[in-house]
Amino acid sequence: MKKESNGTTIVKNFMKSQGSVFIILLVMCIIASIFTDKFLSVSNLSNVLAQSVTCGIAAIGMTFVILTGGIDLSVGGCIVFSATIGTKLLSEGKVGVGTAIIIMLLLGVLVGVFNGFLITVLKMPAFIATLASSNVTAGLALYISMGKTIIGLPLEYSFIGLKKIAGVPFCVLLMICLYIVAYIVLKYTGYGRKVYATGSNRKSAWLSGINVRLIEFSVYVIQGVMSALVGVVLTSKLLTCTRACLKNKNCTKRMFYFPFHDKIKKKGGSLC
């Protein structure tokens, strides 16, 4: 018998564990297409996916956090904080598009490091630490922007949020790539196994030689980067930066629903 390739094995394992989700999605699409003729059109599906990109990207980082038994309430603050500073520098012509994006992502790392420090070093409960972090970062963003909408962003900045490749929005392709990378990391790498172990039983993970504090610290950094990336996507779509738009409560709620899939709850830890 011929051995199956690694790629085939990965696809089969993925469908075995997540197949039910795709079946439900397929049924929903069929029902929607019965009532609306244009539901399955390329343009409509692209728009639907594009609308879910921001919550979807943030949910990637939240999945890592929840799997370790933590929670991160600083997502909204991190988004508006990183986006405000990056777009302000960009609108004033102090940096280019590429530099502005890098600055936003680094600010996301900074917020993640701050959260990780509060939780793993100062031993603060994740709920309290990240809630405080959210208020601090949102307040800083409000101070920096003086409560005003940041406009005058260059047109080339819109390529992340509005550009399409073969009819598919670039931001959708970016989200899909990030999901594939996250799935491979969690399923097939030592780091992913350590994340699961930390969430399942911290003491057992520590006794087995896993640096639990480092793993927990790292997932908040990942969440910070994902949050900052959401800020990039949102501001590149609108070519403006407003606090009300970036700190969308409905999106924040939906972002928490993404990781609370039954399999993630079973494999991850309890919320702190």
Write out the residue ranges for each language-model feature.
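Hydrophobic core segments of alpha-helical transmembrane domains in multi-pass membrane transport
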Residues: V21-S33, M62-T63, S134-G139, L174-I184, ...
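Hydrophobic alpha-helical transmembrane segments
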Residues: Q18-I23, V48, G56, G77-F81, ...
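Membrane-helix/interface signature in polytopic inner-membrane proteins
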Residues: V181-V221
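Transmembrane helix-bundle core of multi-pass membrane transporters
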Residues: L122, A126-T189, I215-S218, L234-L246, ...
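Transmembrane alpha-helical segments of polytopic membrane transport and secretion proteins
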Residues: M1-S20, I31, L40, K267-G269
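Alpha-helical transmembrane segments within multi-pass membrane transporters and channels
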Residues: K94-S134, C177
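Single transmembrane alpha-helix segments in multi-pass membrane proteins
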Residues: L26-G93, F117-K123, T252, F258-K266
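Inter-helical junctions in multi-pass inner-membrane proteins, predominant
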Residues: D37-N47, L186, G192, Y220-F256, ...
